[in-house]
Every structure is written in C-alpha cells, then in structure tokens.
Amino acid sequence: MDVTIQHPWFKRALGPFYPSRLFDQFFGEGLFEYDLLPFLSSTISPYYRQSLFRTALDSGISEVRSDRDRFVILLDVKHFSPEDLTVKVLDDFVEIHGKHNERQDDHGYISREFHRRYRLPTAVDQSALSCSLSADGMLTFSGPKLVDPSHGERTIPVSREEKPSSAPSS
C-alpha cells in the first residue's frame, strides 16, 4: 500500500484568487501576470482560462511516498543534468541541491538553483539508499525500510476466564 505523504493536488488552486504557479517548482521559468493576479487573466485574452488543476509532472511538485517496504522521493528536475545535482544524506535528512550556471535559452540567459530537504523515516536502511535521474527529468531517491521482526504479524491466543468481567456491560 502506497501512502503519499505530500499529495500534489493538495497545493493546487482552490479558487480564482489563488496564485497556482507561485509556489510551484518552476525553476527559473518566470511568473506571468496571471500567476500573481489570476483574476486579471483577461488582460492576456478574454477567452483564455488557465487550468486550475495540473498533473504532478507538469507542476514540478515533489512527491514523497512511504509504504511498508520502501521510502521514495520523486522530484521533477528536468532543467538539470546529473552533473548539476548534489544529493547528500546528513543525519536523518536527505538534501537535494541543483544549480546550473547562466546559459542561453530561447528567451535570453537563465540560471537556476534549488535546495530541497526531506526527513528520512527512522526505519529506512541508509546503507541501501539509491538515486537515479530518468530521461524525462524525474529524480527518484529511494531506500528500503528495515524489517523489524518484532513488529511482524503474530497471532495472540484468546484465553477463557471463569470469572465475569468487572467492566460494566452496555
């Protein structure tokens, strides 16, 4: 069973006055007028309506999953190469830092930098952590959880007592 700790739709626009892109992870892509004042989006076009909900991959929001066997962080870093990224584990935290120097793109020159810090669950095996970058720019940081035999499934026998219970009956 996957349990999403930080669900992407939770931070989506909940109304017309919520700046949906303001807190998203668009590293250096810039904000537009309708991002800061979405009710004025008619200045761009009276027929344009920005979607209030986007997919997690489009928005760049990180996602943290923790299930019974595994801990996973998914992070959209499509504007960074593996050489631009640094992933460190410090005590009970994983720090992901990305930075690339100024480079030219279609609209001029741009530089990007971000820093993310996540707390690792105590049950994660820190000696078996791994990190990979997919071709479409998704960084996946994962690690297995330690198996604690004392917390496994066990059967508790039910004994029968001869005396009645002292608890009041309903």
From Swiss-Prot:
Bias (Basic and acidic residues) occurs at 148-164
- Keyword field contains Phosphoprotein: yes
Residues bound to Zn(2+) 2 are 107
> Which cellular component terms (GO) are annotated to the entry?
cytoplasm; nucleus
Q: Which InterPro entries match?
A: A-crystallin/Hsp20_dom, Alpha-crystallin/HSP_16, Alpha-crystallin/sHSP_animal, Alpha-crystallin_N, HSP20-like_chaperone
Where the record annotates domain sHSP, the positions are: 52-161
Share an example GO biological-process annotation for this protein: lens development in camera-type eye
The chain residues annotated with the modification N-acetylmethionine are 1
Keyword Cytoplasm among record annotations: yes
Residues bound to Zn(2+) 3: 151
On this chain, the residues bearing N6-acetyllysine are 99
> What does the UniProt record tell us about how this protein is modified after translation?
Acetylation at Lys-99 may increase chaperone activity. Undergoes age-dependent proteolytical cleavage at the C-terminus.
Region annotated Required for complex formation with BFSP1 and BFSP2, chain positions: 1-63
Please give the residues the UniProt entry marks as glycosylated: 159
| MF terms in GO | metal ion binding; structural constituent of eye lens; unfolded protein binding
What is the annotated localization of this protein? Cytoplasm; Nucleus
Residues recorded as binding Zn(2+) 1, renumbered to this chain, are: 100, 102
**Where Deamidated asparagine occurs, residue numbers?**
101
Subunit structure of this chain's protein = Heteromer composed of three CRYAA and one CRYAB subunits. Inter-subunit bridging via zinc ions enhances stability, which is crucial as there is no protein turn over in the lens. Can also form homodimers and homotetramers (dimers of dimers) which serve as the building blocks of homooligomers. Within homooligomers, the zinc-binding motif is created from residues of 3 different molecules. His-100 and Glu-102 from one molecule are ligands of the zinc ion, and His-107 and His-151 residues from additional molecules complete the site with tetrahedral coordination geometry.
What is the protein's known function?
Contributes to the transparency and refractive index of the lens. Acts as a chaperone, preventing aggregation of various proteins under a wide range of stress conditions. Required for the correct formation of lens intermediate filaments as part of a complex composed of BFSP1, BFSP2 and CRYAA.
Q: Which family does it belong to?
A: Belongs to the small heat shock protein (HSP20) family.
Report what the protein is called: Alpha-crystallin A chain
Organism annotation: Tamandua mexicana
